[in-house]
Amino acid sequence: MLTKRIIPCLDVKDGKTVKGVNFLNLRDAGDPVELGALYSQQGADELVFLDITATLEKRGTLVELVKRVAQHINIPFTIGGGIGSIEDVSACLNAGADKVSVNSSAIKNPALIDQLSKEFGNQCIVVAIDTRNVGGMNLVHSHGGTKPTDLDTIAWAKEMQERGAGELLLTSMDKDGTKAGFANELTAYISTHVSIPIIASGGAGTMEHFTDVFTLGKADAALAASIFHFKEIAIPELKSYLSGKGIHMRK
Amino acid sequence: MKLAIVKYNAGNIQSVIYALNRLGIEPVLTDDVDELRSADKVLFPGQGEASNAMNYLRSKGLDQVIKDLKQPVFGICIGQQLLCEHSEENNTDCLGIIPAKVKKFPPLDKVPQIGWNTVTELKSPLFKGIAEESYVYFVHSYYVESNAYQIATTNYILPYACALQKDNFYAVQFHPEKSSDVGEQILKNFIEL
């Protein structure tokens, strides 16, 4: 039976892991490759590395990070952060990434997802969606969640699947950094209205929140950052807790 | 030991190379006929689309070279599917080394299957030291139908052949290079065949 996945996310800036609260106030949390290897040993099912470095040599730093991760870690990982072209994706996949995550570039040019899935197969194309409730509407936000768009989150999720996304990484900006639980209602709605896996992100604070996102939220995978980085929840305990709740986990 | 990896237009070869490096092997990535023929072991990995991959292999004459190999050959992911007779992915005639058919998952659950699933009914030296119900990592939309050359089974939507063996040809649908310690052991088993 296919298991639900626990995915630590490592936000990387200038080669170091950072984690923001509501995407602001970055704090340093160590070397991404060392941290990734530690999570892998602890039973993480996958890793996500988001490079938030904003320099002209962007692709170079991305590819260097991918190489180091792929050399040292034997579980799958996704790389994201400023990926905007076939060339970027090709460079990351050739360096050893399993999947790439595309966000703002897909908003700017939705046809990019058609091109990428045709070129590389949909299994390696993750579309990241940052969503926030604005006046009762769930709207997609771009540029690390800072810029609102007029795209309805649910319609956008469906469009991204149709264009060839293999997986959706749904981050609730309303929940991110709050530790008050995932956006279960929205996650469940999207998960049951698309036919590709959903990674839920934003709001993890307790082990119970993970139970909720897999049951109420119908998520295929759950992503979290600071609760793992700052050792508030350990992955082995989390997975054994979830197994005890009847949620299928890799042992 | 000389291990050659078939160089063609399928992606994600670098992870396999790194996984072999971790086992102390420096593989040669090549489409050179003599190098492939003279290698002790041949790996045929990759991710990609079946018809593009087959067209490329035919255009380079690699289809015949692979069929004629006598040393242990290990197909991974699309490599497994290409060793079969036919794939529903763009109605593609494959290498036909293993008489089995590749089908698309019916839309009864999420497709692609992405994540960790168990392997059972393990039947080959490839799985020496691997426990039944071990977890390995899958990413795929097409699967190999159950058949006489099946050496392991996975269940997703339906039970299917997640590993095959016929003569010197071995193949798995999952990614041993991404399957943590279990995958590492399977790669080691292939190297030690």
Swiss-Prot record, chain A:
Pfam families: His_biosynth. It is found in: Cytoplasm. GO terms for cellular component: cytoplasm. It comes from Cytophaga hutchinsonii (strain ATCC 33406 / DSM 1761 / CIP 103989 / NBRC 15051 / NCIMB 9469 / D465). The gene is hisF. This is Imidazole glycerol phosphate synthase subunit HisF. It catalyses: 5-[(5-phospho-1-deoxy-D-ribulos-1-ylimino)methylamino]-1-(5-phospho-beta-D-ribosyl)imidazole-4-carboxamide + L-glutamine = D-erythro-1-(imidazol-4-yl)glycerol 3-phosphate + 5-amino-1-(5-phospho-beta-D-ribosyl)imidazole-4-carboxamide + L-glutamate + H(+). IGPS catalyzes the conversion of PRFAR and glutamine to IGP, AICAR and glutamate. The HisF subunit catalyzes the cyclization activity that produces IGP and AICAR from PRFAR using the ammonia provided by the HisH subunit. It comes from the Bacteria. Keywords: Amino-acid biosynthesis, Cytoplasm, Histidine biosynthesis, Lyase. Its main location: cytoplasm. GO terms for molecular function: imidazoleglycerol-phosphate synthase activity; lyase activity. One of its GO terms (biological process) is L-histidine biosynthetic process. CDD domains: HisF. The active site is at D11, D130. Its EC number is 4.3.2.10. InterPro entries: Aldolase_TIM, His_biosynth, HisF, IGPS_HisA/HisF, RibuloseP-bd_barrel. Heterodimer of HisH and HisF. Pathway: Amino-acid biosynthesis; L-histidine biosynthesis; L-histidine from 5-phospho-alpha-D-ribose 1-diphosphate: step 5/9. Belongs to the HisA/HisF family.
